[in-house]
């Protein structure tokens, strides 16, 4: 027994707590056979509540009026009973209410910046290769780049019971490689495509199994007979069939390379120090049509066709490519073009992406005219500036100012932007 009693969180759903039954026995049967039911638990709450109040001189019941995860902002039925019944019938009880408000000022979050100490710079230099995806990460958020490539914080790994986006894309790429690998160096004709389309339709299960076995991390997906993964399997079949039929309209063309690695070594003079960087890319498909070399990249994710298919009529667009992450496909296309042209100087080259979510539109070309040497040089000049910024010890890794960039970032909890 206490003279002064304070009870916190007297909200409906907390006091009494919401009842949930995990019993397989229906409520009516439990009630009939006098087994414990939710009403009994509520009665226990009521007993202990009023027993606590019985000999107290001053009782303070506190509840939260704000809605949240664990509260609907509604005061408990016990408070209503005290106000409307207990206080009304007992003249010795005086009940009154107070609404307390406070100006709460949340502490301002400090922006996170990572200085480029000698140790951090050494971590950057140990990064063997820089891909278009890696550099796009820096454009998106320098701090995210640091976490991923310098600090090498691993993203949370999950056991893949269902297809991840990565698994979907990797298996698609492997199937396309299997279908075209025997055609490298040959001119693909109408008849060959008709035969390929027919072969694919009749042997898809075998091709699927082969692709999953070649990608050893996806061996468990080789034999799918039911469930969501079977649906994904059928979606990939439809996508590949659409690609093959679209390729049929492009014949004749000659496949030069599939899933080939391309590299370019760059020497950067940063504050008088020479830093060697290797730029790397994996080209999905390189082909020749009408004496023009074409690099095609399959995209299983979402692509903004309005942005990616825009004609580049001025150099300002290349400037925006290095500032706007929404143009990352354009950045990747020019990045691949730069790698390829540095080892194939005489090629007339165009680059494009196969946006598989909008496959009906065919390939989106960066430009339908071959990339000029001036445009290539301008891109590489901007690329050098970006690389020097990454390795410049006077430029720290800072958070992006655009919160939208944090939406799918695996490290957003570190920055308190989740």
For each feature predicted by the language model, list its residue ranges.
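Glycine- and acidic
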Residues: 30-38, 60-62, 116-120, 124-134, ...
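C-terminal, charged and often intrinsically disordered regions of DNA end-processing helicases
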Residues: 80-182, 402-403, 407, 411-412, ...
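Non-catalytic protein-protein interaction segments used by genome-maintenance enzymes to assemble
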Residues: 257-341
